[in-house]
Regions:
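Alpha-helical transmembrane segments and their helix-helix packing motifs
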Residues: 1-263
């Protein structure tokens, strides 16, 4: 904790307010001694968090939330893409998930052809996409390593073991195309749930906890807003009447994407 003249003055005022003796009755040396004892009484949990620690916790939570959203959105898009052509265009579905993920421009710049295989690869394991699931988990682990003392053992174990398992699944999918995609997406969702559960069940309700919550909620709001925007401006063809069969299937998929579908 950095001690400045302003902080010393504030502590002195607080001490004066909590005592029946006026501070003016003490000499400067005695006042300084009172300030020192007051500072020593401050608990470690009351000290200000370093900005870099707060930043790492915030982005750790955002990356974990983003990976979970991408896994659920990919799962929903795969369902929509399997609908009969009479219900819509599969290419539109894959373009919509790129827009929902905020990755449409990066995908176009990569020179990839817009199809199912390329979109899935770009959003899962592409190293040239900083917003892919692989990149999100790697960056989440990097931030977690920087603030391990602010995390509980359960949270770190979830992130670290999840990262190692993701690397194994990546090798398996590279050898076997996208046959294991369903298993991989389910694994990412379970990893995210374990992380959230660890944060909720094991973290002290201090600054570290609230910075992780802020990161998660901001990322969730951002993803949900983009998803709704895409639903209204991209997915539904003009000829389709709102409330029709395609509209129903799309809303059902969106509920799955945001974990809001009831059983």
């Amino acid at each position: 904790m950095d001690i400045t003249s302003e902080s010393l003055f504030e502590i002195g005022v607080e001490v004066a307010q909590n005592t029946s003796i006026s501070m003016h009755e003490f000499s400067k040396a005695e006042q300084a001694s009172i300030f020192t004892h007051s500072l020593n009484d401050i608990k470690p949990s009351d000290k200000a968090m370093l900005s870099r620690t707060a930043d790492s916790l915030y982005w750790l939570a955002r990356y974990m939330e983003r990976a979970d959203f991408l896994a659920r959105a990919l799962e929903a898009s795969r369902r929509l893409a399997t609908l009969p052509k009479a219900y819509g265009d599969a290419e539109t579905e894959w373009r919509s998930i790129l827009l929902s993920a905020g990755a449409a421009e990066a995908f176009s710049a990569s020179g990839r052809v817009l199809d199912e295989k390329n979109v899935i690869e770009f959003l899962t394991f592409a190293t040239d996409n900083p917003g892919s699931i692989r990149s999100c988990i790697e960056l989440a682990r990097l931030n977690a390593r920087a603030v391990r003392t602010a995390l509980t053992r359960e949270m770190w174990d979830t992130i670290n073991s999840g990262y190692l398992e993701m690397k194994n699944l990546e090798k398996r999918m590279t050898d076997n195309s996208t046959d294991d995609l369903t298993h991989f997406l389910e694994f990412i969702k379970q990893m995210s749930l374990a992380y959230d559960g660890g944060a909720y069940r094991t973290m002290l309700r201090n600054d570290a906890y609230w910075f992780t919550r802020i990161g998660s909620f901001i990322e969730r709001a951002d993803n949900t807003a983009r998803l709704l925007d895409v639903k209204y401006h991209v997915l539904l063809p003009e000829k389709e009447i709102v409330g029709g069969s395609l509209d129903y299937f799309q809303w059902n998929a969106i509920l799955r994407a945001v974990s809001a579908q009831t059983s």
